[in-house]
Amino acid sequence: DRYKQLIGQMALLPIVNRGIPIVADDYVESDFGTGVVKITPAHDFNDFEIGKRHDLPIINILNFDGTLNKEVPKQYHGLNVDEARKLVLKELEDLGQLVKTEPYKVQIPRSERSNSILQPLITNQWFVNVEKLSEEAIRVVENNETQFIPKNWENTYFNWMNEIQDWCISRQLWWGHRIPAWFGPDKRIFVELNQKAAEKAAELHYGKKVVLKQDDDVLDTWFSSALWPFSTLGWPDETADLKKYYPTNVLVTGFDIIFFWVARMMMMGIHFMDGQIPFKEVYIHALVRDEKGQKMSKSKGNVMDP
């Protein structure tokens, strides 16, 4: 209620001199601080969702190398984020619009491997709609067709599955299973088992042979891992091993990958194996930690040499 008279009006963004709309959204806690936040839909996960709800423009200001692009004033072109921040402060001060500067703690996303600060960037990716897939995977655990040991880890499984979102399965890496998608000369996409099949489909569509370019992205490692219970046994062929060993009795794993691996194996197994669960029991073991209680990781350098 404090700012309802401002909703629907515009604020002027300094330096850029662009009008930005003032909107109301439940994401903001009205009784916390000023009850007002600035959002950047192209460079923050929560802001992106708010931007979609209010049909706000998605303005990306970053190049892939982390420098600023031509969506910003000319004096900022090519600067990295740290350089740009310093120049913003100087320009605001020169304009007489800088009220104060003070140290302020905020949550900043960092790479779990390099510890570098992450700068979110809007890009085109491949997604799997897993909402329907999750429904049956939830049901079989609720009905004890698959059981967690200890049983309390079912809560972690359900928490993830009940809040599941579309799964981004594409990665921009040098190593991995290449996404089986090919682009035609007009960017039409052909998804096939191999390039020969894609070329055949493209020839039927265009009425002639054309040059196709395969997508450079690779699959999320957890995608191929999700197929492990049956793909290692000869699937999609109906092999003797597949008939004998699928489903298996027990999966032994750590609690930290219940969602990343266990849940996805459940969804993929049930979907591709005619409703059959991949395993009957999931045995969750403890994690070996270092003397400070931290998970052992190559990136942290706290792994013991065996």
What are these regions, as identified by a protein language model?
Residues 2-9, 55-56, 104-106, 175-180, ...:
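A short, compositionally biased
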Residues 18, 27, 31-186, 211, ...:
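Residue patterns forming the tRNA-binding/recognition surfaces of aminoacyl-tRNA synthetases
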Residues 1-27, 56, 116-139, 206-237:
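Conserved oxyanion/phosphate-binding beta-strand-loop segments in alpha/beta enzyme cores
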Residues 37-39, 43, 66, 143-149, ...:
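Conserved active-site neighborhood of enzyme catalytic/cofactor-binding cores
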